[in-house]
């Protein structure tokens, strides 16, 4: 496999608070990596570094062998990185179809002149974007709500809309920030199947932050655990789940294994 992402000794401070402390790991093409940790461990902060919302104080982040740390956030999608957010960021006054089409514009070439005069190549581009959007709506089971506004849809459906919008940018790396948040057991199971399908059928490498242990362990090829901004474990799902440092981080001393009966990692 070819290495796609290489996180090297990334550190970030907010004043006197250490948010990330020398975090390193890599991700190969075609893998699904689960990033776990108690609340405040630094997971979303690391995601924000990967998507260039934050700039590390130290370390480097390489994507396809090139550093990301000097690239502005609006130039991330064009190199093949897309993400979803814990708090959905859909355009509430645009239809589901339009939300997905907007995602496709992230990797399109356009300028003021072509927009103003509707040049032929731009019309062809718009037609291709709409065709791709309909394909994604079919894949994610959203065709029936294509002309609906997101705000009136159930949470699980809105999460699929945001996922479709991210995929419309044709990413090589997809960052999923707590995709199972607020979903019921059946919806989480369906999400797990969907994540695997996206990896296999769309050939997308996936990095997800998630508190739902059963989901992480069922879909991930590799898991990285953080605590207080440091990496405390890395390995297969089974290895990380039984790691003593991970057990201590989640449950404190005196426990033999992480309890996954509820499907969620207990908060510290």
Indicate residue ranges for each PLM-predicted region.
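Glycine-rich phosphate-binding loops of nucleotide-dependent enzymes
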Residues: 2-268
């Amino acid at each position: 496999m070819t290495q796609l992402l290489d996180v090297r000794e990334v550190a970030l401070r907010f004043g006197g608070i250490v948010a990330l402390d020398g975090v390193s790991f890599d991700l190969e093409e075609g893998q699904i990596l689960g990033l776990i940790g108690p609340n405040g461990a630094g997971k979303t902060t690391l995601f924000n570094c990967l998507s260039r919302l934050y700039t590390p104080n130290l370390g480097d982040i390489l994507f396809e062998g090139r550093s990301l740390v000097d690239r502005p956030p609006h130039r991330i999608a064009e190199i093949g990185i897309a993400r979803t957010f814990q708090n959905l960021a859909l355009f509430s006054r645009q239809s589901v179809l339009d939300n997905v089409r907007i995602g496709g514009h992230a990797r399109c070439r356009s300028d003021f002149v072509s927009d103003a005069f509707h040049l032929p190549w731009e019309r062809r581009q718009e037609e291709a974007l709409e065709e791709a959007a309909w394909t994604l709506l079919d894949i994610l089971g959203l065709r029936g709500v294509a002309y609906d506004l997101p705000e009136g849809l159930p949470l699980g459906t809105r999460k699929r809309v945001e996922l479709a919008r991210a995929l419309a940018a044709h990413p090589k790396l997809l960052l999923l920030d707590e995709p199972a948040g607020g979903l019921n057991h059946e919806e989480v199971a369906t999400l797990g199947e969907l994540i695997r399908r996206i990896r296999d059928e769309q050939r997308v490498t996936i990095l997800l932050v998630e508190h739902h242990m059963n989901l992480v362990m069922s879909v991930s090829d590799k898991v990285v655990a953080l605590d207080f901004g440091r990496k405390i474990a890395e390995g297969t799902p089974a290895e990380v789940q039984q790691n003593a440092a991970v057990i201590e981080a989640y449950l404190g001393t005196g426990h033999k294994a992480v309890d996954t009966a509820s499907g969620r990692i207990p908060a510290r």
